[in-house]
Amino acid sequence: LAATFTSEAAKETRELVIGRLEDEHIIEKENPYHHTPLIKTFHSLGLMMLSEQSDRLGLLNHPTILDSSDSLSIIKKAVEQLGLDPKINDPSKIRSIISREKSDFVSVTDYKVKVASAQMEIIHSVWRIYQEELKMQKAVDFDDLIVRAVHMLEDHEDIRGYYQNRFKYIHIDEYQDTNGAQYAFIKLLVNPAHNNICVVG
């Protein structure tokens, strides 16, 4: 398994690996993906794993994935619904705060406990509406893909063991850019029996 941050980086890495394996006659040019290592972004890896285990988790096999613009659109509507001035309560900044909190495993319920200012109360109100809209659309955002995958691995020992055995060697690109959720994701995927992991960055 190789994990990186962008689809472009994953594509370039995949092409390089396939080219090298073909040169070494390890894989056939006619069927290059048959024995190729799995190379994905963190988010696409999370989505793949959640989809594979959807029956166990009671999830849709192919949930709607909201990109950044979709998320921002919902947050703009939430700001409007609450009668807030978007010039004072910038939807882009609110989205960034929600994303950061999710990446640190803070849920909307957890954030409510942290509220210590009027601005945080506003963020919580927007976040609550945002999560309700996601639930209604049966959708997840990018942050949910990794956070939910981490919770799955933490809560289900058999699923964690399956992926630890499946990914015997793990390579992480641009490791210095990982956030708390991505670090936890990596840690849970590494098999403690041999700790075969290489990080770059």
Which positions does each model-derived feature cover?
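Secondary-structure boundary motif
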Residues: 19-26, 81-84, 136, 155, ...
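P-loop NTPase Walker
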Residues: 1-61, 65, 137, 161, ...
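Short helix-loop boundary/capping segments at the starts of domains
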Residues: 6, 19, 23, 55, ...
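ATP-hydrolysis module of ASCE/P-loop NTPase motor domains
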Residues: 33-36, 55-144, 167
